[in-house]
Amino acid sequence: MKPGIHPEYAEITATCTCGNVIKVNSTAGKSLHLDVCGACHPFYTGTQKIVDTGGRIDKFNKRFGALGKK
């Protein structure tokens, strides 16, 4: 590796909107603000909501369903 061309690698803090603070190593060099993290993301907390996409699928099939038939 060439000396002097690589960015500085430092420890920064990533702060989530839920208040969770995570220390990570990064070349960004400044603190990060996160919308969601592992402590508040619905997938990890088990509070998932099932989104009803049936209307979207029916609308798509109604518009483009005849194109797939030969």
From Swiss-Prot:
Listed GO CC annotations: ribonucleoprotein complex; ribosome
Residues the record lists as binding Zn(2+)? 16, 18, 37, 40
Q: How is the cofactor bound?
A: Binds 1 zinc ion per subunit.
Annotated GO MF terms:
metal ion binding; rRNA binding; structural constituent of ribosome
Question: What's a Pfam family in this record?
Answer: Ribosomal_L31
For this chain, the family text in UniProt reads: Belongs to the bacterial ribosomal protein bL31 family. Type A subfamily.
Described purpose of this protein according to its UniProt entry: Binds the 23S rRNA.
Record's subunit section: Part of the 50S ribosomal subunit.
Protein name stated in the entry: Large ribosomal subunit protein bL31
Species in which this protein is naturally found: Shewanella woodyi (strain ATCC 51908 / MS32)
